[in-house]
Amino acid sequence: MESSFIFGCVAEKMTSAIPDDKNWYLKGSFDKANRTSVEAPRGPGIYDSIDIFEDIKEKFTNIKITTDIHEPWQAEKLRHIVDMIQVPAFLCRQTDLIRECAHNFDVINVKKGQWMDPGSMRHVVEKIRYYNEDAKVYITERGTQFGYDRVIVDYRAVDIMKEFCDGVILDCTHSTQQLGQGTTGGNRNLAKAYVKTAREFGYDGIFAETHPAPDTAISDKDSQIDLEWMASVINTI
């Protein structure tokens, strides 16, 4: 989440583009805790972000908010304002983090670790339901490690993971990432193709980073999708 202004721009544009009967979440990260460079901006922090989330919900009453957490104590702080909590891919096996997510939230989205096979995600879902048997659990595919510096999407994973979770989401932007020297690259055109074709491969939904001016984005600028384009196609997929 670069700023409250940009977050508000995305909220306004997507709210006007998506019908009220569609199930969607506005996502903003309060802390980009795994930036490639120690000098890279990380975000506004949890407490300022809670204020931003509250302002957005007051202005757009039909919006549901999601964010990701990195430490167990953060779950309790967010439970009153966040509708779905996200477990980052790098942390998807951390039992203490998963426990606190399950104790504080009934809707949980787990990003599949880039190194994990689809079937192994069953154990992550079982952990969540051990602590909250009524939790609705989604798994987000964000690519599988392919060599040292890139990820690819294995479409065979969809049906495997659907057997033990409530829905499988395709992360259209992070799934194009290419690791670099101090920055993370990506492929915006490929991300757009994923947006358009995810349904054909059986995904239940999409996750995508969008920005009013992607080339100026502080994070993941090579894979972020232009906000105008996203708003124009969201109801055609």
Regions found by a protein language model. Name each.
Residues 44-45, 60-74, 83-97, 106-118, ...:
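Catalytic beta/alpha-barrel core
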Residues 105-210:
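Catalytic alpha/beta core domains of metabolic enzymes, predominantly
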Residues 25-27, 66, 86, 109, ...:
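Conserved beta-strand positions in the central sheet of alpha/beta enzyme cores
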